[in-house]
Amino acid sequence: MCRRKPDIMILTQIEAKEACDWLRATGFPQYAQLYEDLLFPIDISSVKREHDFLDRDAIEALCRRLNTLNKCAVMKLEISPHRKRSEDSDEDEPCAISGKWTFQRDSKRWSRLEEFDVFSSKLDPAPGAPAEAPLKTAASHESMLTELSERQEVASVLSLSSTGSLPVHAPHAGDAATPRTNSVISVCSSGHFVGNDDSFCSLPSPKELSSFSFSMKGQEKNAKSKTRSLLKRMESLKLRGSPHSKHKAPSKLGLIISGPILQEGMDEEKLKQLNCVEISALNGNRINVPAVRKRSVSNSTQTSSSSSQSETSSAVSTPSPVTRTRSLSACNKRVGMYLEGFDPFNQSTFNNVMEQNCKNRESYPEDTVFYIPEDHKPGTFPKALSNGSFPPSGNNSSVNWRTGSFHGPGHISLRRENSSDSPKELKRRNSSSSMSSRLSIYDNVPGSILYSSSGDLADLENEDIFPELDDILYHVKGMQRIVNQWSEKFSDEGDSDSALDSVSPCPSSPKQIHLDVDNDRATPSDLDSTGNSLNEPEEPSDIPERRDSGVGASLTRSNRHRLRWHSFQSSHRPSLNSVSLQINCQSVAQMNLLQKYSLLKLTALLEKYTPSNKHGFSWAVPKFMKRIKVPDYKDRNVFGVPLTVNVQRTGQPLPQSIQQAMRYLRNHCLDQVGLFRKSGVKSRIQALRQMNESAIDCVNYEGQSAYDVADMLKQYFRDLPEPLMTNKLSETFLQIYQCVPKDQRLQAMKAAIMLLPDENREVLQTLLYFLSDVTAAVKENQMTPTNLAVCLAPSLFHLNTLKRENSSPRVMQRKQSLGKPDQKDLNENLAATQGLAHMIAECKKLFQVPEEMSRCRNSYTEQELKPLTLEALGRLRNDESADYQHFLQDCVDSLFKEVKEKFKGWVSYSTSEQAELSYKKVSEGPPLRLWRSTIEVPAMPEEILKRLLKEQHLWDVDLLDSKVIEILDSQTEIYQYVQNSMAPHPARDYVVLRTWRTNLPKGACALLLTSVDHDRAPVVGVRVNVLLSRYLIEPCGSGKSKLTYMCRADLRGHMPEWYTKSFGHLCAAEVVKIRDSFSNQNTETKDTKSR
């Protein structure tokens, strides 16, 4: 019994320390600070009122920790203070979920924005315990809750909320006090108390408070020894699970959803700008669709419009077949309307739509057909078209010569027709234009078996629908051979790298020429999970098309290629209403806050539904936040390389060859039965692996077996050093599908995904979207989400590897001797399968900001940190007469101040690139470091400046498009450029104010960039916020220059941890690419002269 009490005390101290760690990790660091400052206990009810936007489970998880700290405060248990943040610390940026607290960077402490009493003279009673009277004060030194200490604790905390310097009065302090009281008195010695408990005198400001020190006097040495002994015992003791109070079952009342409500501020002018049309006011008229413009990489907030080309049969205005096909595909996929208040379940709406459809059918005669000239060359658009009535006999059917589709009588074979109401109107491809059925004839099915539009066998015995069927089949077979030869001729061409290119020279496969539609429905193999076409014309090449002359400096284009997969990006583009909720659009401060809320939500759910021995306080802090030394991967390029290393090398977490394998399967192999289920040939798979290791950027998969490529893709994820879900969180994912109820699993999964490292989350999103497209062709490949999960779950979760690592040799030997897995293994495999299948089915909802975050708008929306306008940049100087030119001059002065001080205070950072890399912490703004990379370039400063300004496409392999928005003066302009991202993630959009200087001392040049908000710059992706970007070019003799690049930017969708681990490597890689562009130019010039 004598030894049991110290053990209980040690365990309670461990719980207190881990409770403080949990509070910091979940967005409540202010309470951990109060406990370490010996200012507990606190009033739990006040905390609940302060966080009323949280749900019940999250509040209960918070209160459990606070009650633990209250108990420890009464027991006089102390923990070691949280270590102070140093300049080289990798600790997370302080972040509080509540918007009523702010972090004072000068004093490194939390303070309240308004007075709010969280202290009470009594503790909250335990659940089910009767209410007790307030604790009485005592004169003994052992008392922890004397009246004096309570009042002084309140005064000390309220002083944290002071934002200005206030007058200070001396107190009356003569009584003896405990160490806790002494520490409080030392802080509040300048405060004066009056008789009323609720009224206090003026209190010190946070700056004044930071100058005070807590005096421990005689207790200091004893406390240090206690701390050391505590830490030693914590290493040897394991946390014992403690039973938790049972929670009431959640309310079973269903969620009540009201009807559509018009948003505030949506006046008539706003509705007119959004092209909104009142449904009831249509009156049978069609909606005019605006004209299509030159295609660019567009964000989902923009609505692409349809083509406005002339619909006449003129040969001059008729586009090529590929152009027309692309236009139709783009229009039908992206043209949309935002109908505010539209009720799709209103019966009157259905009646109007049905009446409109009937009018559409009656507006076209059923005997209209378009004739193609006899000398028409297959594969090209006809030079002239004529329409008329069907002949009385013989030619009462028409064939689409490009696809082999046969149309029965009465079907209009051309999809763009003239209308009496609107001559230039675009008719939707999937609208009903005929009451008769459409039949398709293919050369790979028996001629006696024809399927009608509904999928049933056509009754050919009762009526001879096609009198010249043999001739038609003969022509179709010939056409198929020609089209195959035509597609093979251009199959090696790659994607276009321009963001404004809308068409390619030819489609990459016959499937992409035309999307078959049967009775207004696309075939499953041609649709992705969102209903968009999978076979839209793919950008032909992985090698960007040259936009230069091809001679001289244009020969220096980088040899590193980037995959252009625009169809994958466009098919999974979020809707207009959900674009702001996408994770990849959030700022770094919002991501930091979102991660802490996700940890809070996940902890609350797991503690509520999992057994007490399945979780503990130690679960709270994910291990990926800790610094881990990784081995060297110089001898590997693809397989076995961590995703973080891929980001540091190329800027993208997935290697280019793996992305190309996914694109090959998505474009050409979705009709293969049992894809990912049937095994490939080992020798061919090994050959594919060697191809990936040797040719990282460009691997040609043409002619490869779909099953070989799919197996190679599985092996890639299986060979990762740790599972895609990470070693720590894989077990958490399995617990979610073993213990959490079905209706709560989606919330738990969204929270767990936010705890993944950024590169793992991005790869998971890409993979899930890709697998959802595979399941969209389930009628052909027979692969449902569950079937795919059975095949891929072991590779993604590393189930077998985890079992071997977590099991002892004796246990593994016993399992092998029994020849069957135990029940735990079966449950984990089932949970992994169910989890992956659920993630595939709900992939679009997993990567969105939870709706609960909108309840704490004060703390979340303020963290967005949008770029400033030109006028706002001038106001940063607090000078009414200042403008953006004064801001730019200040930037130039600060740059040369760094140079004059020889970059004092910068910390060196190791990188695999051949450049010097260092960083410097910045106290203002978002939690982002300022990075600096330096390299020697074999060119003069003027040449380097020209390359940075005018020739970005020669060294930036991710560049999609660029243009100058506005020229402000001879050395200042607004510049916009777009960079590619790994599909299906949206492109990155930069709008910067840039200025350059060439008349600097010693022949140096400088280029400065800062993001701005400009009304003439359309949003064509995720808008990046460049806080600071500087290029300094100094001559160093022998025709060489020293290039120094400094950058601090918020790329959106990344945690602070990602910027610490990866962003610096990207800065170093950028200067290396700039240098290589000149090195390649010099090498090619020498080779030309030698010839």
Curated annotation (Swiss-Prot):
The lineage of its organism: Eukaryota, Metazoa, Chordata, Craniata, Vertebrata. Residues 297-323, 386-400 have a biased composition (Low complexity). The keyword Cytoplasm applies. It comes from Canis lupus familiaris (Dog). The SAM domain mediates interaction with EF1A1, and functions as an autoinhibitory regulator of RhoGAP Activity. This is Rho GTPase-activating protein 7. Interacts with EF1A1, facilitates EF1A1 distribution to the membrane periphery and ruffles upon growth factor stimulation and suppresses cell migration. Interacts with tensin TNS1 (via N-terminus); the interaction is decreased by phosphorylation of TNS1. Interacts with TNS3 and PTEN; in resting cells, interacts with TNS3 (via C2 tensin-type domain) but, following growth factor stimulation, TNS3 and PTEN are phosphorylated which leads to weakened interaction with TNS3 and enhanced interaction with PTEN. Residues 614-636 are annotated as: Polybasic cluster (PBR). Residues 641-847 form the Rho-GAP domain. The keyword Phosphoprotein applies. Residues 877-1084 form the START domain. PROSITE patterns: RHOGAP, START. GO terms for biological process: actin cytoskeleton organization; regulation of Rho protein signal transduction; signal transduction. It is found in: Cytoplasm; Cell junction, Focal adhesion; Membrane.
